[in-house]
Regions:
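Conserved short histidine dyad/triad with adjacent acidic residue
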Residues: 28-50, 80-85
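Short, conserved beta-strand element in jelly-roll/cupin
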Residues: 49-64
Length: 105
């Protein structure tokens, strides 16, 4: 995933979840693909997915447990994880504020 997105359309209205503890902005790239750039503040959260997602951590660290799994996996800045469509995952922030880029595939 690129560190910088060129030639995008940015949606000004933020996506705000969990009383402002998770915030993202949607961008649409030149191919029409949707991405979100966001922040996840310390805490534990559960998310559902409609489309498949690729999450890349830009800063911070977390633990993730995908639906149907019993084990948690640790991720840090520069690492990615994939979430299937029509699924869910749990995430616990373990270091700092997680900054992320999410691509919908």
């Amino acid at each position: 995933m690129p560190k910088q997105f060129e030639n995008v359309t940015a949606v000004a209205k933020a996506n705000i979840y969990f009383d402002g503890r998770v915030i993202s902005h949607t961008i649409i790239d030149s191919t029409g693909a949707k991405h979100t750039l966001g922040l996840i503040y310390p805490g534990e959260y559960h998310f559902g997915t409609a489309a498949a997602e690729i999450m890349e951590l830009v800063a911070g660290a977390c633990r993730v447990k995908l639906a149907g799994q019993t084990d948690w996996t640790d991720y840090a800045a520069g690492q990615t994880f994939n979430i299937p469509a029509d699924s869910s995952f749990d995430i616990v922030i373990t270091e700092g504020i997680v900054e992320y880029a999410c691509s919908y595939v």
